[in-house]
Amino acid sequence: EEVRDAYIAQPHNCVYHCFRDSYCNDLCIKHGAESGECKWFTSSGNACWCVKLPKSEPIKVPGKCH
């Protein structure tokens, strides 16, 4: 399966906000990624970034979280 590095998304194009790398690492691995970290996302906070996340998993795309 193809993979990519990206911000993993919840339903409705919303990111997973975070404070700790360990939270994102566990979340990303649970969704099939190699690893994850808590990265700067916008001025409103940080979000989980996954490394080698399977293409079948949703990622943050341009547009609002709704």
Curated annotation (Swiss-Prot):
This is Delta-buthitoxin-Hj1a. It is found in: Secreted. Residues 4-66 form the LCN-type CS-alpha/beta domain. Negative results: shows very weak activity on Nav1.2/SCN2A, Nav1.3/SCN3A, and Nav1.7/SCN9A voltage-gated sodium channels. It comes from the Eukaryota. Its main location: secreted. Disulfide bonds join C14-C65, C18-C38, C24-C48, C28-C50. This recombinant toxin slows fast inactivation on Nav1.1/SCN1A (EC(50)=17 nM), Nav1.4/SN4A (EC(50)=7.5 nM), Nav1.5/SCN5A (EC(50)=9.2 nM) and Nav1.6/SCN8A (EC(50)=37.3 nM) voltage-gated sodium channels. On Nav1.1/SCN1A channel, it acts as an agonist by inducing a shift in both the voltage dependence of channel inactivation (alpha-toxin activity) and activation (beta-toxin activity). In vivo, shows moderate insecticidal activities. It induces irreversible paralysis in blowflies and lethal effects in D.melanogaster. Keywords: Disulfide bond, Ion channel impairing toxin, Neurotoxin, Pharmaceutical, Secreted, Toxin, Voltage-gated sodium channel impairing toxin. CDD domains: neurotoxins_LC_scorpion. GO terms for biological process: defense response. Pfam families: Toxin_3 (PF00537).
